Amino acid sequence: MAGSIYGKLFTVTTWGESHGKGLGVVIDGCPAGIALSEEDIQIYLDRRKPGQNEFTTKRNESDKVSILSGIFEGKTTGTPISLVVMNEDQKSKDYGSIAESYRPGHADYCFDEKYGFRDYRGGGRSSGRETIGRVAAGAVAAKVLKELGITLTAYTRAIGTIKVADDAIDLNMVNQNPLYMPNNTCAADAAAYLNEMMEKKDSVGSIVECIITGVPAGVGEPVFDKLDAKLAQAVMSIGAVKAIEIGDGTAVVSSIGSDNNDNFYMDGDTVKKRTNHSGGTLGGMSDGSPILIRASFKPTPSIFQAQDTVTRAHEEIVMEIKGRHDPIIGPRAVVVVESMCAITVLDLLMQNATAKLDNLKRIYRS
């Protein structure tokens, strides 16, 4: 299966299936000398693991990570880092009824057409559990970025029609509610809405936003590896993401140039912008402002209602899905978005190191 490797210099290869023995990731290109422990990675994995509240699947997984290689005496060695998480609570029998039929909204049909064979247990590689490897790698990338003064903060911006207004965002509230919303009032309203949808055996869409601060100007590789293009690719590769916005996003359509342009000014010796409609990127490179990316997630396709579908033999049937499923994807995907952004920014920072001769001189003429 191609397409499981991401990155050029900081590379991430995820592996494993939802109902296999385990899942994991191999990270290559991580600099040596970074203090790293299983606890550092576990903090990230705990943010996405199931069964933490009423709005997540009841699948009972500890998602405990083990480091197999690449760490010695608590520090990265510069060699490939292998991380593994074992599956503990698979209930594959819940999926026996779909072995010969296609779930609406899922990738079952497409996998069958592509490979002529598929792991129907929980979706295999298309399951949300595939993101375990991404999050583990993101924890490592974030640790490196922290050494460079770069931080990432992601949160649930909207659930259904309930959206946190720009002037109501309080990042201190993100970890104070189970939906990771930056406003507790909106979180309470969203929780009530989710309970209503769950009673109707339905699911809800959401928006996850990520702010990246501390990235110096000039990071990103024109033309095809632009910063915003790579961020969009990374986040769009997360299952269920249907749209990406950078900065003002689609709102620029109704804007005019004189409003949309971010005027520059000098703050001492530093070039800054008075506004940030561009979302921290210009010409595919960072401009020194906070980078803002927004991802729209479709409603969870696994709903507990009767739905029309077809079998592998092309027979039309009515299906009722069983199993344990989230009524919403966004909140558990917050750390996944954050992780993919961290991986992307670190990879582009490494590529940027060779952009100027002065950079090489600082390294090799010290």
Question: Can you describe what each PLM-predicted range is?
Answer:
Residues E113-V223:
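Glycine-rich, mobile lid/loop segments that gate access to catalytic sites or pores
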Residues T11, S302-S366:
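Internal helix-turn-beta structural module
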Residues L45-P104, D108:
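Glycine-rich, N-terminal phosphate-binding loop and its surrounding beta-alpha-beta segment
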Residues A99-G124, Q307-H325:
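Short acidic, glycine/tyrosine-flanked loop/strand segments centered on an H-E-D-like triad
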Residues W15-K21, K201-V204, V208-E316:
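Glycine-rich anion/phosphate-binding loop at the beta-strand->alpha-helix junction
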Residues T11-T14, D119-E130, A217-E221, N276-T281, ...:
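A short glycine/serine-rich beta->alpha loop
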Residues K21-G33, R129-I150, D225, A229-Q233, ...:
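Alpha-helical support elements that line or immediately flank enzyme active sites
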Residues M1-R59:
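N-terminal, positively charged regions that mediate nucleic acid binding
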